[in-house]
């Protein structure tokens, strides 16, 4: 396995270079702006390429070291893509709504996850003895909890890295990550504040094709990390295993 490859052409075809209208910009993004066309800022892809490569390396390294990556993207055009990418790479996701305290109040979130698991058990049991109305209420509760927490139910604790689409919309998630010292990889559009992001990726965060490209690359970087981790585990096992020594032949038995 190796880090996923991508080209400038792919970025252009996905519309990664298109920012927002010039009047909507965040002046802190000036270093990443190439210019403007028809009152729309054009993001400097010559900077996006190395910064995206660095982000992919961080994701791979985190997973290779046994870390967990949380994908966050709750807006309509990112929601399904985020979930698919996280599932494909055996990572975790929040794609419906970020609940305040999702990271900083993990104990409460854990209790809700336990409740979700309990509901799964109850509803899976044929001999539960509930009325139709009671069962319907339990199913609604489970659906609500699963929509909010289904992507992190098996995470087992706070993540080691977060990947975020739309830093303006996910500002609470970023604040919580900062408070806990969790590094953040995020796409920063021309209307974003790059200061809060540890590993920024300058680019369009609205176009579905662009979002799909980022998520695919991040997922593949995580898969590369898994392969590296398994490879290292295999080497460790190989190094620790004793090489069997064949017994020396008895000269008398050769005769």
Swiss-Prot record:
Keyword Ribonucleoprotein: yes
GO molecular function: structural constituent of ribosome
Region entry Disordered, spans: 235-255
Pfam families: Ribosomal_S2
GO biological processes: translation
InterPro entries: Ribosomal_uS2, Ribosomal_uS2_bac/mit/plastid, Ribosomal_uS2_CS, Ribosomal_uS2_flav_dom_sf
Cellular component aspect of the GO annotation: cytosolic small ribosomal subunit
Superkingdom of source: Bacteria
Keywords: Ribonucleoprotein, Ribosomal protein
Similarity remark: Belongs to the universal ribosomal protein uS2 family.
PANTHER family: 30S RIBOSOMAL PROTEIN S2 PROKARYOTIC AND ORGANELLAR, SMALL RIBOSOMAL SUBUNIT PROTEIN US2M
The protein's name in its UniProt record: Small ribosomal subunit protein uS2
Organism: Sinorhizobium fredii (strain NBRC 101917 / NGR234)
